[in-house]
Amino acid sequence: MSAILSNLENSMHKNKFWNNYRSFCNDLHQEEIDIDHFISLLPKIFKQIEKNALSYQIYDAVNKLSEFQPNKGIELFNKLIKIESKEVLTLIPSTLDGISKSNVGFNKFIEAEFLLENNLDELKKQGYAFLITLKEEELNQNQDFSGYIYNLIKTDIENRNTIFFSYIIRVLGKFIMVLPEADENLISLSKIDSQEVLYEITRLLSYELDYSNNLEIYEILLFNLKTIDPKYHNIISLLNHLVFQKFIIDSPELIDRFLKEWLLFDKKRAGEIIKFSNTFEELHSKNSNYFKKMVTSWLNADDPVFHKAISKLIMEAPHNEFKNLELDENYLGQLNYKEIQFIVIKIVGYIYFKELIRSSIFSILKVKIDDVDCVNFIKAIFNEYIVFNYPSTIEYLEEEKKKSSRKVQKVVNEIIEINKEYFEKINQLEFINEFNPSDKRLKIYNGIHQKEFQIKLKETTDNKHSFLNMCKNIQLRTGKGMFSKHEGIYTEKTEMSRIQSSAELPRGEFIDAIGQEKIRAIYRNYTREI
């Protein structure tokens, strides 16, 4: 019995398993092992390494074993094909590939055909998987085998043998320049609504297919993915982190177009656009010019699905990264008054953060400063909605005025003057005592709340499972300093500092909440005049 196999077997479900597993995979090709013993361990090994990043090492180990000890590899292959375990059968491609690298007389094409013509679906899958280990020149040099693969793939697609489609996509992707009709077959498969199939298409776009050399087929496959369901998280993750990353700088219009088509395919998806927030934020940080253009064009779109999507993306984005929202100057410069009015209305209807509302509308003012109608409408929006709800906007305008042209400064001064006068008059109004709450009623109200607070406090104190029982580090304060004791050791003393935060809530919500919501609802449902 081989020591390397015994050591691995004895460490199953123990802490030292992973050290033994790594050593086993590194040294397997040098060891004289009993294949039957090895095969009997494989189900246990696969169970142990399931969903672990090191799971690939067993495939590399079997590949090297078959290359350096081809007789063992052939014995292993002949016994693997009789196994029923799906996980264990996945070692077949690595085994065949390793044997083919050795100098023994071994016809891998015959063995591949044996697997591909097998009545057992699991063995046929491994036959397709083995094809991926071949090289383009091997298929070019063996036209008979290449023709055999072409006919087999065509038959499986026509017969809708869907269990093989994910493997077929990998084969077609690798040999797209070799196999006849590979493009057409990939396009056909990309139209199938199957998470497994669409994942393989996305994986192909991520790793195998080069956009610059396969531009037409790449775009067709990409836009066929517009059908993907928002619940296909693994596909969306590949799009966000691999596919779209290729286009953020040089071809952002592809991302823009894909997201539009994805939204229009099912307009109920507007709220699910947040699944692509990573791409949205990457565009904002790495290609701000196109980001501005994209946001501006979506706000100017007639279909409200784009307004809802932009609102969702912006509202859910990290607030520290989206303190301002400027729109695209070139795009805005080509618009007429009605189009500018439409965009401003949608900003007010769909965007809620004061920083984003005022900065986006102010960026429009700077571009359309020579259009009297646009200026008057924007002034009205500032006066009646933005400054009315957020008086601090006056301070914002004062700062922006310093960086603006004289024409813009003139308009800003008009807005500031009107609103300062308004707030001065508001502050001069006398309080009417009849509208003040009763002191007696307030006393009773506060007493009830105080009693409830005391009850809750007592319940928390008496609860043995209180959150405070989880606290292991006790903070100690001395003078102006603070230190703590952690695992029996006192930390260095640090000086305490004051933490303060403030927020400006919209005035209109306190004065007339229903009226404010009515304004936003009207603006959200506003349609462009024809």
Q: Where do the language-model regions lie?
A:
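Non-catalytic all-alpha helical scaffold/repeat segments
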Residues: 1-530
